């Protein structure tokens, strides 16, 4: 029997081979899959004909999260897909924030995925075998002043640094 839950799944860095078995199982069990339209090309082989797919454009994260709660609160199992890992610049933080704001009883399950920085590191050798950091250059949710401080701190500490969202 299906239950009202949201599965937030990281689908990896852009290749079906990088999607974890746990995410594949979640896709198969979901009534509804919600995500950025580009991501569906990587997952369609695991979806049944009955699965409702809702694709949205970029910068529609809040709308995707709201839709997920609307469907889950109707008793559906909903899978919200993110590229890479859903907890690293993905949908998981927003889903948890919205759960708190709504006072929702919907169960949340986060399934990690392989991040772009992990995939890139594997192709380069082993540059993140010790301490490292990840910094996003996106100023949509963080001021540029804070981003600059983080860049300076990472450089001062001599961290290997993965940079997301360069403009």
Question: Which residue stretches match the model-derived regions?
Answer:
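Structural signal for conserved beta-strand scaffold positions within catalytic alpha/beta enzyme cores
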Residues: 35, 54-55, 110, 133-136, ...
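Active-site nucleophile and cofactor-binding loops and adjacent substrate-binding regions
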Residues: 109-115
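Beta-strand/loop-alpha-helix module characteristic of Rossmann-like adenine-cofactor folds
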Residues: 2-8, 115-167
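Class I S-adenosyl-L-methionine
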Residues: 1-108, 119
């Amino acid at each position: 029997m299906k239950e009202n839950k949201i599965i937030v799944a990281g689908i990896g860095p852009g290749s079906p081979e990088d999607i974890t078995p746990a995410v594949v199982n979640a896709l198969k069990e979901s009534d509804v899959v919600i995500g950025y339209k580009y991501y569906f090309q990587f997952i369609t082989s695991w979806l049944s004909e009955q699965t409702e797919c809702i694709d949205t454009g970029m910068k529609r994260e809040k709308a995707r999260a709201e839709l997920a709660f609307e469907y889950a609160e109707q008793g559906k199992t909903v899978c919200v897909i993110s590229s890479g890992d859903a907890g690293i610049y993905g949908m998981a933080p927003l889903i948890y924030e919205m759960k708190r704001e709504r006072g929702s009883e919907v169960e949340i399950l986060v399934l990690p995925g392989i991040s772009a920085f992990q995939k890139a590191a594997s192709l380069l050798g082993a540059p993140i075998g010790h301490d490292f950091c990840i910094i996003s250059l996106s100023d949509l949710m963080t001021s540029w002043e804070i981003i600059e401080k983080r860049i300076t701190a990472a450089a001062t500490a001599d961290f290997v640094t993965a940079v997301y969202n360069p403009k």
